[in-house]
Structures are given as structure tokens and as C-alpha cells.
Amino acid sequence: ASDVYKRQNEIMFPAAILQPPFFNPQADDAANYGGIGAVIGHEIGHGFDDQGSQYDGDGALRDWWTAEDKANFKKRTTALIEQYNAFVPSQLAEKYADDPSKAPHVNGALTIGENIGDLGGVNIALKAYAFALDKAAGRPEDGSPEAIEASLATAPVMDGFTGLQRFFLSYASIWRSKNRDELAEQFLQIDPHSPAECRTNGIVRNVDLFYKAFDVHEGDTMWLAPEARVAIW
């Protein structure tokens, strides 16, 4: 599996990950940026999560943040923790449908580092995809939100899906999984990663471009009010 090594200040990806659903040399950029791109971004994000942020650029454990930065980081991560604390995996919600009070929830504090990585990874990959479109069109890179959105809008439509839609569909596809109920409950207790569906739905609902991609509005299942959406970086 891919990983980040804080003391060495490096990230690692085994060659075996460079295959579908993460990467396909025959696929278009949207699919690959939504797949391996988000994974690469995830590992970069670990450098600035609740643990990685304690190490400096040389891999030394050092307090290098300002008090203001720490306070803002704490505020944003707390909001993300609270979001995930409210999640119950759908298979367990179904299992405990007769008594929802017994349904186990995601542990937002346990999974915060991985959730920060996932959220950062998607946003990094979206920006990288936009820059790839800019390069192909001979446009200068512009990292502003407005320019990113404009660049992504130039992606070709394929099989009836826009570039943005293909990006998010690819991201969702890399987390497809199926577990027994017993294992799903065990993972909630010990795994620092959120359940696969939460790594998908819990993340994209915080990304403004997801709403534009699928025309999500208030009242839709995936809707999260703009003021409640979290952006760590």
C-alpha cells in the first residue's frame, strides 16, 4: 500500500498500484486523476494532517506552527470529526434498522488523519487535473478556485459524462468494497480509515465542485450546506 514516512519526509507508492481501478494508461485524464491522483494527493495530505503537521520539512519532530495556524487547524479538524461521528455505514444502519440507537457510528477522532488525507487528496487531484488540461491547451496555470473551475469545464464529454463527473466516478470506484457485518463493526473500532462509503460520500460532500458536477441541491441526500463544508487546506 502507499504510505508516507514522516521522518524521511517522503511518500511511497508500490508499482503494483499502477493498475485499474487506480491507474490505466488507456483511460482519460479524468479517470486517472480521480484514481491514482487522489491517492497521491492523499499521501501528500498526510504531511499536513494531525500527525504529519508535527514534523518539519526535514522530517524532524518540531513545533513549527504559529498559534493562529494551530487554532484554525483545530477548528476545521473538529468540524470534520463531528461530521464523521454522525456517520453510520449503510450496511450497519440496515442491520440495526429495528433499533437505530444500537447502530455503531464512525469514530471521527480515530479516523481524522485519514479523512484529512482523503479530503486534501481529492482537492489536490482536482487542481492537478485542471493544470493538465491547461497544459494540453497551452494555457498558463492558475490555482484560483475560479480558474480551476473554468479549466475543468473545458474537459471533453465522454460517454455522456463531463470531465468532472468522470473524476468523481473514478474516485468512488477505487473504494468499492464489500465486508461482512461483523468485520465492518470491527473495523469501526480499530481501523484509522473510515469505511469505504464514508471515504467517498463523506469527502465529496465537502467539495464545492462535486455539487456543480452532479447538480446537487438542498434537499438532495448528498447536500451539505456551504457553511458546513470543511476545507482543511
What kind of region is each of these model predictions?
Residues 39, 43, 47:
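Catalytic glutamate of the conserved HExxH
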